[in-house]
Amino acid sequence: VYKRQVLHRGDVVVLDMEAGLEHMGRGTTEGMDQFIVVIEPGSRSVQTYKNVKRLAKDLGVKQVHVVANKIRDEKDEEFVKTHIPAEDLLGFIHYNTEIMDADRQGCSPYDYSKSAVDEIRKIKTTIDKIDDCDK
């Protein structure tokens, strides 16, 4: 459906795709110039990022960035920093019970967790800086 929409230069479309690589072979990546891969602090998740990055390059996607999710402590942050190149890492979203509470109540985390909103704003600022450099 999104391919049929008229987009203008500078427009942004965000697609939340299923975990894994299967969707990449279905033409869903056509016309995309960057991916944001959400990982968790674990070896399988890091390997998925590496596979996505390799396939993205083959498909002509120039940039693959990472948001690390469900970070519990400094060990998790250090694990991610050790395995993800600094230029690809957009930031961290820490494990947060308020997010789970919001989901159970059918509420947006944006309305429920100031700390999550602050972390997401930091990530958005990083994305904006990258976009400014690309212009």
Language model: regions and residue ranges:
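Active-site loops and adjacent core secondary-structure elements that bind or stabilize anionic groups
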Residues: 1
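Serine-centered coil/turn micro-motif
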Residues: 42, 114-115
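C-terminal boundary of histidine-terminating zinc-finger modules
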Residues: 105-114
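Exposed alpha-helical structural elements
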Residues: 79, 88, 115, 119-122
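C-terminal alpha-helix
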Residues: 119-134
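Conserved catalytic-core segment of NTP-binding enzymes
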Residues: 4-92, 97, 101
